[in-house]
Amino acid sequence: MNIRPLHDRVIVRRTQEEKTTESGLIIPDSATEKPSKGEILAIGNGKINDNGDVIALDVKVGDQVLFGQYAGNEIKVDGETLLVVREDDIVAIIE
């Protein structure tokens, strides 16, 4: 299924963090928080300002980003859980 977000929204796939500690202990899913890092899969056309002009987004498909832990709405696409996030909820691009 193809999905294209509207306006200033982006589709993000969460990046899984390591589930073992440096000493080799395995951390169960119930003890870990949802990761706040992910990869941009799709972007909208941009934010519309008060004059009706479209302002392009700063992020692009493929960018690795950091976002708020509770940002966005989870959706299921082809059995995969993805996030729909506003660009304002993205705090950094990882370079």
UniProtKB/Swiss-Prot annotation:
InterPro entries with a match to the protein in the record: Chaperonin_GroES, Chaperonin_GroES_sf, Chaprnonin_Cpn10_CS, GroES-like_sf
Main subcellular location: cytoplasm
Gene for this chain: groES
Name of the protein: Co-chaperonin GroES
Swiss-Prot/TrEMBL keywords: Chaperone, Cytoplasm
A GO CC term attached to the entry: cytoplasm
SS bond list: none
Biological process annotations from GO: chaperone cofactor-dependent protein refolding
Subunit structure: Heptamer of 7 subunits arranged in a ring. Interacts with the chaperonin GroEL.
Function comment: Together with the chaperonin GroEL, plays an essential role in assisting protein folding. The GroEL-GroES system forms a nano-cage that allows encapsulation of the non-native substrate proteins and provides a physical environment optimized to promote and accelerate protein folding. GroES binds to the apical surface of the GroEL ring, thereby capping the opening of the GroEL channel.
Lineage, opening ranks: Bacteria, Pseudomonadati, Pseudomonadota, Gammaproteobacteria, Candidatus Pseudothioglobaceae
Molecular function GO terms recorded: ATP binding; metal ion binding; protein folding chaperone; protein-folding chaperone binding; unfolded protein binding
Location(s), subcellular: Cytoplasm
Lineage: superkingdom: Bacteria
Annotated family: Belongs to the GroES chaperonin family.
